[in-house]
Amino acid sequence: MFELLFLGTSASAPSVHRGLAAQVVMVKEYRFLIDCGEGTQRQILRSGIGFKKLNRILITHGHLDHILGLAGLLSTFIRWESMEELEIYGGKAALDRVYDLVHGIVLHGEEPPVPIHLVDLKPGIFFDDKDFSVSAFPVTHRGPG
């Protein structure tokens, strides 16, 4: 059975009651974080699900309200040494922005302490388990990313 947890549902800017885009899909032993807007770490802590096994991040598009939370989240993962590797999935334009954020700001040109895999998605299945699969499809959204 799938469980979907909405961490943030606001757009462009947070509101008093809503954080920026972030959801977690939990199925079996897998957890997929979909988008990572600012405030995602706080929302994860408030939800009680914790950070363990949160090593697959799916980015719907590269707008800042969907990726800026990655900086703090990755910084926490690095500080806590709680991750063996991290996979970030997205389209090329989104991953270009994620790369700049991760390598330019978070790591500041240093090598990551754990492998960080930026996976350029093409339409179709990209994650396949015997009981479920995850597919990518193109989205049209205004602006770059």
Walk through the language-model features, giving the residues of each:
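Binuclear metal-dependent hydrolase catalytic cores
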Residues: M1-G145
